[in-house]
């Protein structure tokens, strides 16, 4: 107080005021404080003080040639006095105004390309539709979401290499562009940005937005794809939500959505094959999504979904350490347990072998439409706090938690036998048996569970067995909360192992995922999914199987032809004929197969009876295990278009139609490809032309090894002999000529000699 009085006293004297306002500051410490370092100590003051001066800006001298000395109002735009300490000119803020109005206009052609993500966002918002605002409690849960629509899925390192290559191509530093996407993007961007005048740093920032997925952990109630997240601040508050339909889609959301659909289809299909893991890998490697290889997408895309994670595990990639049960993602937040096998009796006195988890554990459960916190001990649910969008979602969460708890009253609530099977007709494991049972009907489970009186806790309410809310009573241990449970934020990935049946385990042997956890939801993919694997032919129905099978034979005709004559059994066992079997009526499959195999054997035995069209047409029928019978068929039935259709053994039919003139095969009216050789022109065509330079020595001679296809002949050395398979399924012995002179006459003699060798 004394000090303040003293200061007031001093300030009342005019001399004090004069000293403080007029004298220069010459205390070294003060000068040091305001002048050391590059950092401005009082930016706003500095700005105000600078702008109060007449010429606060400095610029390169050449600006004086581009800006007049005075503007239209006669105000001076730049000073003739040089800036102290540099050879730059001092410029008035008015010069900036003049430049903005009258300065040169640069080309704007690159702006939409560089600021692509912004231009696209404006378009989406322009075409988006905002609906009504609803006031209601928002159950938001924090989820990891993509906040950057329209990006490619490169890793930070990959993107950095692309950016350096595009923006600073001459900088030193090793950059290795390896992935397909890196190379495509680099080429595209280099072309787009020729003669671009925008600052390289800005270009680099904008490219980063385009190439890398940026995620944040945000509270969301509703759509989580990036086109919804970009308007999160407009669509949901604490107590309101605004309906919104985006005005456009972005590729990254489409990739995520299509990847999930492809992965689900592949896991479902692999689960029913003889070797699920091998099949799954084969399908992942041969599938493309929107023109990009699925395996490349899996390596880069962080989407966490059960089927996607199974595919990643199969490829040896790390996945999240949380596990899945009943469509919920469980993450243990505390406690620990040990597994012990125990036999329990259901209410129907059926014995189940359960892997019981002994110990106290706490979990968060996060599903699509409900979330929960679960505390459990050995075979006992202690507490379940659940929140969901609607009654149905809450029921789903409660059922999953009750089954997961392994409580005795849950096992005893089973009525009837448990015999659920998976797609491959194998019995499900006991936990999934119980889950399926109560997912069908949970009435008995809820009634048997027991109820208890509850305390009044803010934000929580009880729930009765018939799913009505109550403030007095609740099912034992179960409460419904207004607040959602956040998704587990840790993005840590762990090394996992996968067994032949696609069960994914962590390093401690806990099962994290299995095909039973893959959702059965069907959806329509946004991007084209191309499954090249024959295992996926049936996904589009019987017609697709039929067409794909015949297309495959035609595409591989050269090798098929050799196998047909040399090693038919191997050919019949090819997996490409597997899907076709489902089209042939079960009762007669074996007879058809026996009939066709006998027919083929006759063709092999009787020279000159080889008939390409017939072999192609009947080959798929020979793949089933044959039954020996005397039956002859003039037509074979296949089940397509909802009924049996007939393929004629000799001649064309609506199913299989070969046009000799155009050499085109149509299956069910759809083009199935062109045969590269004509089955009915004898041997004079392709063979005699290709056999120029070879001498035909006579019939096949086994000492010279298996028959080669015509394409393989080019590998022979001069004078070398080999057996070769010619168009009619006949094998002849040839020798490559030692001289080239007589090549012209070869084609005539070839034709004669082939006839002689055969006959």
Swiss-Prot record:
GO terms for cellular component: host cell mitochondrion; host cell nucleus; virion component. Transmembrane segments: none annotated. A motif (Nuclear localization signal) lies at residues 736-739. GO terms for molecular function: RNA binding; RNA-directed RNA polymerase activity. It comes from the Viruses. GO terms for biological process: 7-methylguanosine mRNA capping; cap snatching; DNA-templated transcription; symbiont-mediated suppression of host cytoplasmic pattern recognition receptor signaling pathway via inhibition of MAVS activity; symbiont-mediated suppression of host gene expression; symbiont-mediated suppression of host mRNA transcription via inhibition of RNA polymerase II activity; viral RNA genome replication. Gene3D superfamilies: Polymerase Basic Protein 2, C-terminal domain. The record marks 627 as: Mammalian adaptation. Pfam families: Flu_PB2_1st (PF20947), Flu_PB2_2nd (PF20948), Flu_PB2_3rd (PF20949), Flu_PB2_4th (PF20950), Flu_PB2_5th (PF00604), Flu_PB2_6th (PF20951), Flu_PB2_7th (PF20952). InterPro entries: Flu_PB2_2nd, Flu_PB2_6th, Flu_PB2_C, Flu_PB2_CAP-bd, Flu_PB2_middle, Flu_PB2_N, INV_PB2, PB2_helical. It is found in: Virion; Host nucleus; Host mitochondrion. Keywords: Cap snatching, Eukaryotic host gene expression shutoff by virus, Eukaryotic host transcription shutoff by virus, Host gene expression shutoff by virus, Host mitochondrion, Host nucleus, Host-virus interaction, Inhibition of host innate immune response by virus, Inhibition of host MAVS by virus, Inhibition of host RLR pathway by virus, Inhibition of host RNA polymerase II by virus, mRNA capping, mRNA processing, Viral immunoevasion, Viral transcription, Virion. Belongs to the influenza viruses PB2 family. Plays an essential role in transcription initiation and cap-stealing mechanism, in which cellular capped pre-mRNAs are used to generate primers for viral transcription. Recognizes and binds the 7-methylguanosine-containing cap of the target pre-RNA which is subsequently cleaved after 10-13 nucleotides by the viral protein PA. Plays a role in the initiation of the viral genome replication and modulates the activity of the ribonucleoprotein (RNP) complex. Influenza RNA polymerase is composed of three subunits: PB1, PB2 and PA. Interacts (via N-terminus) with PB1 (via C-terminus). Interacts with nucleoprotein NP (via N-terminus). Interacts (via N-terminus) with host MAVS (via N-terminus); this interaction inhibits host innate immune response. This is Polymerase basic protein 2. The gene is PB2.
């Amino acid at each position: 107080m004394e000090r303040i009085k003293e200061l007031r006293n001093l300030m009342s004297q005019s001399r004090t005021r004069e000293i403080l306002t007029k004298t220069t500051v010459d205390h070294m410490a003060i000068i040091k404080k305001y002048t050391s370092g590059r950092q401005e100590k009082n930016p706003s003051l500095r700005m105000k003080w600078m702008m109060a001066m007449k010429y606060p800006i400095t610029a390169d001298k050449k600006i004086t040639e581009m800006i007049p000395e005075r503007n239209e109002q006669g105000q001076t735009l730049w000073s003739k006095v040089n800036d102290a300490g540099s050879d730059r000119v001092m410029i008035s803020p008015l010069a900036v105004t003049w430049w903005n109005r009258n300065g040169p206009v640069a080309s704007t052609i690159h702006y939409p390309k560089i600021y692509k993500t912004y231009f696209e966002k404006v378009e989406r918002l322009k075409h988006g539709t905002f609906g009504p605002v609803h006031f209601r409690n928002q159950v938001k849960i924090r989820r990891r979401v993509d906040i950057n629509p329209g990006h490619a899925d490169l890793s930070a390192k990959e993107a950095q290499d692309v950016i350096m290559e595009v923006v600073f191509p001459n900088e030193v530093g090793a950059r290795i562009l390896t992935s397909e996407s890196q190379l495509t993007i680099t080429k595209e961007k280099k072309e787009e940005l020729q003669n671009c005048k925008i600052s390289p740093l800005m270009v680099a920032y904008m490219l980063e937005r385009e190439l890398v997925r940026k995620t944040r952990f945000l509270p969301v109630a509703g759509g989580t794809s990036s086109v919804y997240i970009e308007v999160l601040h407009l669509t949901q508050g604490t107590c309101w939500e605004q309906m919104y339909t985006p005005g456009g889609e972005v590729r990254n959301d489409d990739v995520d959505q299509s990847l999930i659909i492809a992965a689900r289809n592949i896991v479902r299909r692999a689960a029913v094959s003889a070797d699920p893991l091998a099949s799954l890998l084969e399908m992942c490697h041969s599938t493309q999504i929107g023109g990009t290889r699925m395996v490349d997408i899996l390596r880069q895309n962080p989407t966490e979904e059960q089927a996607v994670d199974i595919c990643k595990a199969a490829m040896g990639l790390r996945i999240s350490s949380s596990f899945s049960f009943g469509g919920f993602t469980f993450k243990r937040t505390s406690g620990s347990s040990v597994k012990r096998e125990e036999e329990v009796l259901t209410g129907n006195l059926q014995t189940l072998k359960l892997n019981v988890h002994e110990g106290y554990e706490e979990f968060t459960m996060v599903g699509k439409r409900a979330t929960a916190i679960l505390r459990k001990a050995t075979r006992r649910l202690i507490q379940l706090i659940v929140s969901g969008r609607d009654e149905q979602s809450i029921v789903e969460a409660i059922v999953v938690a009750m089954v997961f708890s392994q409580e005795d009253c849950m096992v005893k609530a089973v009525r009837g036998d448990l015999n659920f099977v998976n797609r491959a007709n194998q019995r499900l494991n006991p936990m999934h048996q119980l889950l399926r049972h109560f997912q069908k009907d949970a009435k008995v489970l809820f009634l048997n569970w027991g109820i208890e009186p509850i305390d009044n806790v803010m934000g929580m309410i009880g729930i009765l067995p018939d799913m009505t809310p109550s403030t007095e009573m609740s099912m034992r241990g179960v409460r419904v909360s207004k607040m959602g449970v956040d998704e587990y934020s840790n993005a840590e990935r762990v090394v996992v192992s996968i067994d032949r049946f696609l069960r994914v385990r962590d390093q401690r042997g806990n099962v994290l995922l299995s095909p039973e956890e893959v959702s059965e939801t069907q959806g329509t993919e946004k991007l084209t999914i191309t499954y090249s694997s024959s295992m996926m032919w049936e996904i589009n129905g019987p017609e697709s199987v039929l067409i794909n099978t015949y297309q495959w034979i035609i595409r591989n005709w050269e090798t098929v032809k050799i196998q047909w004559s040399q090693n038919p059994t191997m050919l019949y066992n090819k997996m490409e004929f597997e899907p076709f079997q489902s089209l042939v009526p079960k009762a007669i499959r074996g007879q058809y197969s026996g009939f066709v195999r006998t027919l083929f054997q006759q063709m092999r035995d009787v020279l000159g009876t080889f008939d390409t069209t017939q072999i192609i047409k009947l080959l798929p029928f020979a793949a089933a295990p044959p039954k020996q019978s005397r039956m002859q068929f003039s037509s074979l039935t296949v089940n397509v278009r909802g009924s049996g259709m007939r393929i004629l053994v000799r001649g064309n039919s609506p199913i299989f139609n070969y046009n000799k003139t155009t050499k085109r095969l149509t299956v069910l009216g759809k083009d199935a490809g062109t045969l590269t050789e004509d089955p009915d022109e004898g041997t004079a065509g392709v063979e005699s032309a290709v056999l120029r330079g070879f001498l035909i020595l006579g019939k096949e001679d086994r000492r010279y090894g298996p028959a080669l296809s015509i394409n393989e002949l080019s590998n022979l050395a001069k004078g070398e002999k080999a057996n070769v398979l010619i168009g009619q399924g006949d094998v002849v012995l040839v020798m490559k000529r030692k001289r080239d002179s007589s090549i012209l006459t070869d084609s005539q003699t070839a034709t004669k000699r082939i006839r002689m060798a055969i006959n």
